[in-house]
Amino acid sequence: MENPHEQVQANILSRIIGNVKRLNESVAILNQELVTINNRNKNLEIMGAICDNYHSSVQFNLEATNNKKPPL
């Protein structure tokens, strides 16, 4: 005699497996997008560091030559 709930449990398990597969696909796509965003952010981080270094260099040179003036 078969378990009367076996078919219901099999259907539920099948739905769970399908949902987990779709979830895994979505997470993989999300991870790819995050990698892309992180790569773009690296470029912005480098540009910010360049600007900070330039600002520090300009401030140092203005102070060294006594050409630094107060802000307007």
UniProtKB/Swiss-Prot annotation:
<comment type="similarity">
    <text>Belongs to the DASH complex DAD4 family.</text>
</comment>
<keyword id="KW-0132">Cell division</keyword>
<dbReference type="GO" id="GO:0005737">
    <property type="term" value="C:cytoplasm"/>
</dbReference>
<dbReference type="GO" id="GO:1990976">
    <property type="term" value="P:protein transport along microtubule to mitotic spindle pole body"/>
</dbReference>
<keyword id="KW-0158">Chromosome</keyword>
<feature type="coiled-coil region">
    <location>
        <begin position="19"/>
        <end position="47"/>
    </location>
</feature>
<feature type="modified residue" description="N-acetylmethionine">
    <location>
        <position position="1"/>
    </location>
</feature>
<comment type="function">
    <text>Component of the DASH complex that connects microtubules with kinetochores and couples microtubule depolymerisation to chromosome movement; it is involved in retrieving kinetochores to the spindle poles before their re-orientation on the spindle in early mitosis and allows microtubule depolymerization to pull chromosomes apart and resist detachment during anaphase.</text>
</comment>
<dbReference type="GO" id="GO:1990758">
    <property type="term" value="P:mitotic sister chromatid biorientation"/>
</dbReference>
<dbReference type="GO" id="GO:0051987">
    <property type="term" value="P:positive regulation of attachment of spindle microtubules to kinetochore"/>
</dbReference>
<keyword id="KW-0493">Microtubule</keyword>
<keyword id="KW-0159">Chromosome partition</keyword>
<dbReference type="GO" id="GO:0005874">
    <property type="term" value="C:microtubule"/>
</dbReference>
<keyword id="KW-0539">Nucleus</keyword>
<keyword id="KW-0131">Cell cycle</keyword>
<dbReference type="GO" id="GO:0072686">
    <property type="term" value="C:mitotic spindle"/>
</dbReference>
<dbReference type="GO" id="GO:0031116">
    <property type="term" value="P:positive regulation of microtubule polymerization"/>
</dbReference>
<dbReference type="GO" id="GO:0042729">
    <property type="term" value="C:DASH complex"/>
</dbReference>
<keyword id="KW-0137">Centromere</keyword>
<dbReference type="GO" id="GO:0008608">
    <property type="term" value="P:attachment of spindle microtubules to kinetochore"/>
</dbReference>
<protein>
    <recommendedName>
        <fullName>DASH complex subunit DAD4</fullName>
    </recommendedName>
</protein>
<dbReference type="GO" id="GO:0051301">
    <property type="term" value="P:cell division"/>
</dbReference>
<comment type="subunit">
    <text>Component of the DASH complex consisting of ASK1, DAD1, DAD2, DAD3, DAD4, DAM1, DUO1, HSK3, SPC19 and SPC34, with a stoichiometry of one copy of each subunit per complex. Multiple DASH complexes oligomerize to form a ring that encircles spindle microtubules and organizes the rod-like NDC80 complexes of the outer kinetochore. DASH complex oligomerization strengthens microtubule attachments. On cytoplasmic microtubules, DASH complexes appear to form patches instead of rings.</text>
</comment>
<dbReference type="InterPro" id="IPR013959">
    <property type="entry name" value="DASH_Dad4"/>
</dbReference>
<keyword id="KW-0206">Cytoskeleton</keyword>
<keyword id="KW-0963">Cytoplasm</keyword>
<keyword id="KW-0007">Acetylation</keyword>
<keyword id="KW-0498">Mitosis</keyword>
<keyword id="KW-0995">Kinetochore</keyword>
<keyword id="KW-0175">Coiled coil</keyword>
<dbReference type="Pfam" id="PF08650">
    <property type="entry name" value="DASH_Dad4"/>
</dbReference>
